[in-house]
Amino acid sequence: LLRARIKSIQSRLERVRNQREQSRRARRRAELPVLSLVGYTNAGKSTLFNRITTSEVYAADKLFATLDPTLARVDIEHLGPVLFADTVGFISDLPTTLVESFKATLEETADASLLLHVVDVSANNRDELMADVEAVLGEIQADGLPQLVVFNKLDLLEQTPRILRNESGTPTAVYLSAVTGEGVDLLF
């Protein structure tokens, strides 16, 4: 009975992978850049996705509020059309029974043009959470993709939105609040 159930689940996962691969091929043919929101669970990815895309995907302060990647096309001044992808929140020490289904969901991320690594700036353990996300990105071969860190929930710290740049002037991080919208314009 258990073997049959496992086989059924593996078969469904394979169908999902195939469907997503077909979708990825279609997006590549359309040549639209994909900006993928990644980050630890409850970092505010869906709230930021909704703010940028004017969508209304479910956003809640709980585990697995987002279970499937959501895509939305947005026309950005100076860039043109892009696809934004909202992804499932990462968690550490994921039970082995869930690893395969999460990998199937997160494989979309490996095809992104840019990762927007959303971090809850108010979290006391944010460095640890960022490291957990980086580890998962490595597991799905997405750790070599261009990345911009988005420190979200700035409204909880009463700080000013800003951009951090490296020595050559390239943006490396943006501080903003997806809830209030402050600093979101700095992304573009």
Which ranges hold each PLM region?
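Conserved GTPase G-domain signal focused on the G5
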Residues: 5, 9, 44-45, 156-160, ...
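Conserved G1/Walker A P-loop phosphate-binding module
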Residues: 1-114
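Structured loop/turn residues at secondary-structure junctions
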Residues: 40, 121-122, 179
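Glycine-rich beta-strand-to-loop/alpha-helix junction loops that act as flexible
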Residues: 86, 176-177
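Conserved C-terminal guanine-recognition region of P-loop GTPase G domains, centered on the G4
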Residues: 76-81, 94, 102-175
